[in-house]
Design a protein with these regions (language model features):
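Extracellular recognition modules
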Residues: 2-6
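Aromatic (Trp/Tyr/Phe) and Gly/Pro-enriched flexible surface segments
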Residues: 16-134, 138, 149-179
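Short amphipathic, basic-aromatic surface patches that mediate peripheral association
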Residues: 141-145
Length: 179
């Protein structure tokens, strides 16, 4: 980098390289456990019931809630990113049970539980200490898009001391990317 003041060069040119940061845990979605439903983590991270604060996997899904309806919305797939060294990816799919549509989902945090049959709680966020400033957040996705299909990706980084609890029955708890 070189400092320019009023478009004039000043000082000596110095080169540096940014530190290589650590990857998010299970960033390639290579680790999955099937314990009544699919979890994107190792078996020892599932906890006693796979939900809430007892679940310590970095990534969470709505599978524990969907499981009550006999469906799975997120599962491992043998379809890795082209050029990667991995063998897996996460397959997110929309399912329907009892007239309720459940979209495939994947988030950092834990599913908290079901209430009112079709509503649930999600604990968004996990402690993660970056050892370098992220240069970029990149991910690979592919999809089979049907009529009316939509996809949304959100990335939110913060300095929180705890998770953010979302109650799908209370819009005031929803994540708003505009704020």
């Amino acid at each position: 980098y070189q400092l320019l003041i009023n478009d004039a060069e000043t000082g000596e040119i110095h080169n540096f390289s940014a530190a290589t940061g650590i990857q998010l845990p299970n960033a390639g979605f290579e680790t999955w456990t099937n314990s009544k439903t699919w979890y994107p983590c190792s078996a020892d991270e599932i906890g006693s019931n796979g939900m809430g604060t007892g679940y310590t996997g970095f990534w969470g899904t709505g599978n524990p809630g969907a499981n009550a309806a006999g469906i799975v919305v997120t599962e491992p797939a043998d379809d890795p990113r082209p050029g990667s060294t991995g063998s897996k990816s996460a397959l997110l799919k929309t399912q329907s049970a009892f007239g309720v549509i459940a979209a495939g989902n994947l988030f950092i945090g834990a599913f908290g539980g079901v209430h009112n049959i079709t509503k649930g709680d999600v604990y968004m966020g996990r402690r993660f200490t970056f050892n370098a400033r992220p240069k970029a957040i990149t991910f690979w996705y592919k999809g089979t898009v049907g009529s009316g299909d939509k996809a949304r990706f959100f990335v939110c980084m913060g300095k929180w001391s705890s998770y953010h609890k979302i109650d799908t029955n209370d819009q005031s708890t929803f994540f708003d990317p505009s704020q």
